[in-house]
Amino acid sequence: MAKSCTLVLLLVALVGLSLLVSPIACSRKLSKPKPKPKPSMKKPVVRAHNNYTGSPSVTVTTGWAAAGATYYGAPNGDGSDGGACGYQTAVGQRPFSSMIAAGSPSLYKGGKGCGACYEVKCTTNAACSGQPATVVITDECPGGICLAGAAHFDMSGTSMGAMAKPGMADKLRAAGILQVQYRRVPCKYSGVNIAFRVDQGANPFYFEVLIEFEDGDGDLNAVDLMEAGCGWTPMVQNWGALWRYNSNTGKALKAPFSLRLTSDSGKVLVANNVIPASWKPGVTYRSLVNYS
């Protein structure tokens, strides 16, 4: 009987020790989850974009894919300061500098295409320069003309005008639907590292962050978070370029946080302790890293 009791006590001690050292103890302990707060930043309602008339012609250039193009917003504007990627007013500021586009579903990819860069050029209108303009996907064009072909760029007035000959930007914007050529290119944010903007709805039990300015692929396939003293745990794409993570233990998350990014092509980059222990909602934290 004494040996049996000793064996039972030894097993209990081993189980207790394993729970103490397991990463599950950080924030994934199986207990009743704390209700997740409703984030303050909601995905905007995506409406059809209406600055187009007419029908596209068809021209295909070797090495490039064909797409349609229109523009939305002000003629010299940034398209939208909301958008289905969550970049908000950043689209009109450096390094985006209004050179953006809303992508059709094949480009937006349910939000996974946010941040991807493309060269777009036109040759089918007298106002076209034939020189490509580089745009970043920052919004979704969900229906209407955006579903007419395999791909469609609803560009800001600024990026549409960038494809025009000098002095002919207004004429090009007035052309209606353009048939363009496009190709995926690496994003290049010279002198800018990846930034992490903490959502206003984040709190000690719930963390959500907008990730922007990734060189290379520009878009992300996966994001993992590591709490202080813990292991990596996958985050969940909330919408657009926002990723979320919440405690399932009823205990506050333990900052500082490190974030591990996996790009569309599988390249991995780690921003160690990029979110400090004293982090606050609504604040942007700039990392010291970017894809080379």
Curated annotation (Swiss-Prot):
<dbReference type="GO" id="GO:0005576">
    <property type="term" value="C:extracellular region"/>
</dbReference>
<feature type="glycosylation site" description="N-linked (GlcNAc...) asparagine">
    <location>
        <position position="51"/>
    </location>
</feature>
<dbReference type="Pfam" id="PF01357">
    <property type="entry name" value="Expansin_C"/>
</dbReference>
<keyword id="KW-0964">Secreted</keyword>
<protein>
    <recommendedName>
        <fullName>Expansin-B11</fullName>
    </recommendedName>
</protein>
<feature type="signal peptide">
    <location>
        <begin position="1"/>
        <end position="27"/>
    </location>
</feature>
<dbReference type="InterPro" id="IPR036908">
    <property type="entry name" value="RlpA-like_sf"/>
</dbReference>
<dbReference type="InterPro" id="IPR007118">
    <property type="entry name" value="Expan_Lol_pI"/>
</dbReference>
<keyword id="KW-0961">Cell wall biogenesis/degradation</keyword>
<keyword id="KW-0134">Cell wall</keyword>
<keyword id="KW-0325">Glycoprotein</keyword>
<keyword id="KW-0732">Signal</keyword>
<dbReference type="GO" id="GO:0009828">
    <property type="term" value="P:plant-type cell wall loosening"/>
</dbReference>
<dbReference type="InterPro" id="IPR007117">
    <property type="entry name" value="Expansin_CBD"/>
</dbReference>
<dbReference type="InterPro" id="IPR036749">
    <property type="entry name" value="Expansin_CBD_sf"/>
</dbReference>
<feature type="disulfide bond">
    <location>
        <begin position="85"/>
        <end position="114"/>
    </location>
</feature>
<dbReference type="Pfam" id="PF03330">
    <property type="entry name" value="DPBB_1"/>
</dbReference>
<comment type="function">
    <text>May cause loosening and extension of plant cell walls by disrupting non-covalent bonding between cellulose microfibrils and matrix glucans. No enzymatic activity has been found. May be required for rapid internodal elongation in deepwater rice during submergence.</text>
</comment>
<keyword id="KW-0472">Membrane</keyword>
<feature type="disulfide bond">
    <location>
        <begin position="122"/>
        <end position="128"/>
    </location>
</feature>
<dbReference type="InterPro" id="IPR005795">
    <property type="entry name" value="LolPI"/>
</dbReference>
<comment type="similarity">
    <text>Belongs to the expansin family. Expansin B subfamily.</text>
</comment>
<keyword id="KW-1015">Disulfide bond</keyword>
<dbReference type="GO" id="GO:0019953">
    <property type="term" value="P:sexual reproduction"/>
</dbReference>
<dbReference type="GO" id="GO:0016020">
    <property type="term" value="C:membrane"/>
</dbReference>
<feature type="domain" description="Expansin-like CBD">
    <location>
        <begin position="205"/>
        <end position="287"/>
    </location>
</feature>
<dbReference type="InterPro" id="IPR007112">
    <property type="entry name" value="Expansin/allergen_DPBB_dom"/>
</dbReference>
<feature type="domain" description="Expansin-like EG45">
    <location>
        <begin position="82"/>
        <end position="192"/>
    </location>
</feature>
<feature type="disulfide bond">
    <location>
        <begin position="117"/>
        <end position="187"/>
    </location>
</feature>
<dbReference type="InterPro" id="IPR009009">
    <property type="entry name" value="RlpA-like_DPBB"/>
</dbReference>
